Structure formats: C-alpha cells, structure tokens
A protein has these predicted regions:
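Interhelical loop/hinge segments that connect adjacent transmembrane helices in multipass membrane
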Residues: 1-7, 175-194, 207-228
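Membrane-interface helix-loop junctions in multi-pass transport and translocation proteins
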Residues: 35-44, 143-151, 158-207
C-alpha cells in the first residue's frame, strides 16, 4: 500500500508541473494575440522559431537521458552513467550553442530573419540551458524526488510568466507614457526577443536550482561512455 501511495504522490507532482505548463501556454497565447505590439507576422515568427527550438533540443541532448535511465539502473554504474550523460550533454550543448551564436548573421537571413540575429542567439541560450538541466531533472525522476522536480519546473514557469507579463504588457504601457527607465532600452520592434529573454530567465532559474547536480561535471568513464 505504501508503494502505491508513493507512486500516486509522485504522479500528482509530475502531472502538476505538466498541467501547469500547458495551462500557462494557453494563458500566454491570448496575451500575445491581443497585445498591441505583437501583430500577426510577429506571432507567426514566434511560433516558427519555437518550433525550431523543439526540434533542435533533441540534438542538444542527444537523448542521453534515455541512456542514463538505462545504465543508471545498474548500481555500480549509477554515478558514472550520470556523470557521463551530464558531461556529454554539457559539452555538446556549449558546442552547438556557440555555432548558432556566431553563425547567427548567416542563419538569420537564410531563414528570412535578416537583421534579427538576436533571436537565434537567445534561442541558442535557451536550448543550451534547457539541455544542461535535462540530465539533472532525469536524475530527480530516477531518485523519485518528485517534489523537487515539480518545484524546479514550476519556478521555471513562474519566472518565465512574470517576465513575459513585464515585457509584453508592462513595458509597452510604460514606453507609451515615455517613462525614461523603459524608453532608453526597450524597443517594441524586438518584442519577440524579449519573449525569448523571458524564457532564458526561466531556464536559468532551473539551472540555478539544480546547480548541486553539476558537481560531477567533467568526470568521464570512457569505457562506459562507449557503451552508452
């Protein structure tokens, strides 16, 4: 009975973070749609660029979380499997993020976003941070730490939403009133960049909350890594 109770509790926590994430997406979409500074073309750009992020994130993680779950079940390989997965994803993510960052002046016009290189640089940051957190989050699930898993995900969502509201609603309102603290840095034409920046802050929050799980970064068991 205690096992079933624990399983039910974990399911609730994992489900809660997923449900809240979906709810927030439903909340943000109409906020973007009815915003006075996000027109239909910008909304299309936002949707398209986020689709790229979802696809590229697979490359950033190389599905190492699946390898970790497989080899982490072997008690003698638990720590080594985690360190291998963490170090691999960390290295690949930095490498790919740097490529996108420096190649942005060529990537942007090739995809129809000439002069908007900042979008791709911010997306590189989002994907890098999300990839960094993927293995630690997998470890939380592996260890049954559902509360910490849900807390991390919910803080990410909370920070993302707060900054979305700030950039999409508060800043344009203050900008229209010529508040100098806003007008000297805020540019409504780059609202998509601010939305991505909000996601960077959310992902950075997860990274900070999971920082203790990066202690094994750099430790590699090459023999086990070849199997993984």
């Amino acid at each position: 009975m205690s096992v079933l109770k624990k399983l039910a509790g974990e399911t609730i926590y994992y489900g809660l973070s997923s449900i809240v994430g979906r709810f927030i997406s439903f909340f943000l979409t109409p906020m973007y749609t009815y915003s006075v500074i996000i027109d239909i073309p910008k909304m299309g750009h936002l949707t398209e660029l986020m689709a790229y992020t979802g696809m590229l994130l697979i490359l950033f993680t190389c599905r190492m979380e699946a390898s970790y779950f497989r080899f982490g079940k072997e008690k003698e390989h638990d720590k080594a499997a985690f360190d291998n997965s963490l170090t691999t994803v960390f290295s690949i993510s930095i490498f790919l993020a740097l490529i996108i960052f420096f190649a942005a002046p060529w990537i942007a016009p090739a995809l129809g976003y000439a002069g908007e290189e900042v979008y791709f640089r911010l997306l590189a940051g989002i994907m890098m941070l999300d990839a960094f957190c993927e293995i630690p989050l997998s470890r939380l699930r592996f260890e049954g730490k559902a509360k910490l898993f849900a807390t991390t995900r919910l803080f990410n969502i909370f920070v993302n939403v707060v900054f979305n509201i700030f950039f999409v609603i508060v800043c344009p309102w203050l900008y229209a009133k010529n508040v100098i603290l806003i007008t000297f840095w805020f540019d409504p034409e780059f609202i998509i960049a601010y939305i991505f920046l909000a996601q960077v802050f959310g992902s950075l929050t997860s990274f900070i909350l999971l920082r203790k799980y990066f202690k094994g970064l750099g430790n590699v068991d090459w023999k086990l890594l070849n199997r993984m």
